[in-house]
């Protein structure tokens, strides 16, 4: 049986990666509300994300894209932060920023 989940190493080759591209919510965020220093540059963030995904693909990783709209979750592009992935699934941890909770 193949594993659907697993992230027991921070240095092993990546085989499957969940990504979320910066969307309109990220580009129109109120910096003070999300504790950013400035409004994000959405075109630049999208270009950097695309380059990162291309790098992962060239390295042989299977890319899983989370594209569902999340209108009130500007920080949702950071998919690694609040999750501990195990062989049996993901454990959702406590978000650091109050706006990211819920």
Which sequence ranges carry the predicted segments?
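The feature marks the mature, well-folded catalytic cores of soluble enzymes
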Residues: 1-102
């Amino acid at each position: 049986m193949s594993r659907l989940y697993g992230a027991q190493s921070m240095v092993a080759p990546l085989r499957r990666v969940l990504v979320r591209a910066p969307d309109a919510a990220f580009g129109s965020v109120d910096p003070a509300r999300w504790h950013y220093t400035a409004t994000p540059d959405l075109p630049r963030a999208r270009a950097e994300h695309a380059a990162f995904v291309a790098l992962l693909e060239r390295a042989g990783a299977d890319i899983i894209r989370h594209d569902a709209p999340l209108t009130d979750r500007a920080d949702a592009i950071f998919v690694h932060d609040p999750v501990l992935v195990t062989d049996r699934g993901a454990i959702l941890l406590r978000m650091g920023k109050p706006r990211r909770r819920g």
